[in-house]
Amino acid sequence: LVGKVPYFWGGKSAPGWNDEWNTPRLVTAAGSSTTGTIRPYGLDCSGFSTWVFNTAVGVDIGAGTSGQYPNSVAVSASELLPGDLGFLAESDGSGWNHVLIFAGYGENGERMWVHSSGGQGVILNSPSYEASLSLRRPKNVDFNAPVPGDTLGTPISTLEVDVTHYCACAKCCG
């Protein structure tokens, strides 16, 4: 979905490709400067993480950052695995502002995250605020279990491959 799905405040979707992505829709969710405007439909940050886990492994990790955070447990940076989540706190500490999915390490050893970012849509990067993230692992996902699936004839055998596949694959994502 990287580069294919725009950010849309309040954007959620059922598993699989959604033909409504990129079509003009009214933003009805409260709490954003875009509320009441027409924008290309897509996913917000928590809608994206929910979509990835529902599509990739058939697991519901919770709705919204406020639902996903308590459905996860803290992990250290040394324990971080692809598929773990990073939460960015609200500036006043009242809750969680953003959620990202850890995708692995970049060429220079930097941690890479896939997420739906306001103004950019679904992206893969190492954001400037990365050191401020609360690192978490979804409680109801078995990170050691093989993941069923197929990508170009090769079985998908790890959550790392599956998360990468469903986040960036053009074959099954439009």
Task: Annotate each PLM feature.
Residues 3-5, 65, 83, 125, ...:
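A general marker of short, structured functional hotspots
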Residues 50, 54-129:
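...with weaker cross-activation on analogous glycine-rich loops/strands in unrelated enzymes
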Residues 26-29, 107, 131-136:
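Short, low-complexity, polar/charged sequence segments that are solvent-exposed and flexible
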Residues 129-157:
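Low-complexity, Gly/Ser/Thr/Pro-rich intrinsically disordered linker/tail segments
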Residues 117, 139, 167:
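Residues at the C-termini of beta-strands that transition into short coil/loop
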Residues 1-46, 50-59, 114, 148-174:
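N-terminal capping segments
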